[in-house]
């Protein structure tokens, strides 16, 4: 559950369009930290999605991995080179580790993920620049 003051949403600009449906929470928290906000939570509060349990598929696992590495790439708390290392280079390492372990399909999937991240480098760079500003850039009037 989120309780975010309107002033904070306006200062941070709302949720970044780079993240659709997954990853927006991690990105928003990264931006809260960057803009010197603190986060509180209540360990006794429990939230649950109202849906059936579904086992994680290979595709679901890869999507989770992609969103995680995308959020690392977009993390404005890191200098560009560190963000690149925690995302693109980390995915490359996973591809090589999978290859060495004989997990050829997984290695190929990670290489594909690396290409997808690299293809979005310019877009990510632009969002990183925008997200450093304190203005309601993603909030529509």
Region locations from a protein language model:
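A short, conserved alpha-helix in the catalytic core of glycosyltransferases
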Residues: 1-13, 18-46
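Residue-level signal for well-ordered alpha-helical scaffold segments within enzymatic catalytic domains
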Residues: 7, 11, 31, 70, ...
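A broad detector of the eukaryotic-type serine/threonine protein kinase catalytic domain
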Residues: 14-17, 52, 93
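Short linear sequence elements within intrinsically disordered, low-complexity coil regions
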Residues: 20, 24-27, 33, 78, ...
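Flexible, glycine- and charge-enriched loops at secondary-structure boundaries
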Residues: 22, 57-61, 104
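Surface-exposed beta-strand edges and their flanking turn/coil or helix-capping segments
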Residues: 27-30, 54-55, 97-101
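A contiguous binding-surface segment within folded domains or other stable secondary-structure elements
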Residues: 31-86
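Non-catalytic, C-terminal membrane-associated alpha-helical segments of glycosyltransferases
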Residues: 62-67, 80-141
